[in-house]
Amino acid sequence: MNIKLDKVSARHPAAKRDAAAALRGVSLEVSAGEQIAVIGPSGAGKTTLLHVLGCALPPSSGSLQLNARDPWRLPRSKLQLLRGELFLAPQVPPLPPRQRVVTSVLAGRLPHIGLWQSLRSLFYPTAIAQADAALARFDLSDKLFARVDRLSGGERQRVGLARALVTEASLLLVDEPLSALDPTRGQQAIASLTQAARERGATLVSTLHHVEMALQNFPRIIGLRDGELAFDLPAAQVTPERLQALYAQHLHELTGPAHEAFDLPAAATPPAVMHCR
């Protein structure tokens, strides 16, 4: 799916009137099949950008075009059809606790099948092999018929990502897919997502706190800070100096593997602290 943002600003409905917009004047273009990582400190507007791209939040100014169509100018019925071409994976996947994993994974197919088949699949899943194959990419085949409430936090996150592998959406929007995963599982998850998107020519946009993972796995990197576009560059051109400027006053978010990889000056590095994300 092709994407075009032209000077887009966005404000959350619950935000106070005098609060700054979560996104401010962001312009960018994405070609069908591109894979992009969005990085930046906490509160930079990364999740808001995904919500705008996923037609979950309308721009307060500027324009969004998906495949040369402004979704907010479409009739409601056509907007719903367009949303069926989008897949938004939130950081915490909304998985019903008593639901079987196979049903949760196959929920990714619901926008692409008929109403009757959707209802039937809630009780009698009909694409079990597809769900099993998706879970296998995340080493979760043994959880196919487990209940969601018996899973760990990391397993639930991987189940949410497995949905992206069964959907037929042409735009995958993935919010912080590694927040509950260790480095090994995180690399596995990113590899599975990028490979699946590449296989079917889908556009992939993912927000990431793990800067090193973003630079190693995505050819194009978008940096956001305070709701504004700081840079839009090939991964090879994202230098340590650019990262220091992007994360100024937030350098603790660069600690860990990404920090070591870029060998940031010790004088600029605050003491290491633990974060729960």
From Swiss-Prot:
Single annotated GO MF: ABC-type phosphonate transporter activity
Pfam families to which the protein is assigned, alphabetical: ABC_tran
One GO CC term on file: plasma membrane
EC number: 7.3.2.2
Primary localization class, coarse: membrane
Keywords tagged on the record: ATP-binding, Cell inner membrane, Cell membrane, Membrane, Nucleotide-binding, Phosphonate transport, Translocase, Transport
Domain of life: Bacteria
Domain ABC transporter span(s) in chain numbering: 3-251
Membrane spanning residue stretches: none
Binding locations of ATP: G40, P41, S42, G43, A44, G45, K46, T47
InterPro entries attached to this UniProt entry: AAA+_ATPase, ABC_transporter-like_ATP-bd, ABC_transporter-like_CS, P-loop_NTPase
Record's keyword annotation contains RNA-binding: no
Annotated localization: Cell inner membrane
Chemical reaction(s) catalysed: phosphonate(out) + ATP + H2O = phosphonate(in) + ADP + phosphate + H(+)
Topological category with respect to the lipid bilayer: Peripheral membrane protein
Described purpose of this protein according to its UniProt entry: Part of the ABC transporter complex PhnCDE involved in phosphonates import. Responsible for energy coupling to the transport system.
Family membership: Belongs to the ABC transporter superfamily. Phosphonates importer (TC 3.A.1.9.1) family.
Oligomer status and interactors: The complex is composed of two ATP-binding proteins (PhnC), two transmembrane proteins (PhnE) and a solute-binding protein (PhnD).
Record's protein name: Phosphonates import ATP-binding protein PhnC
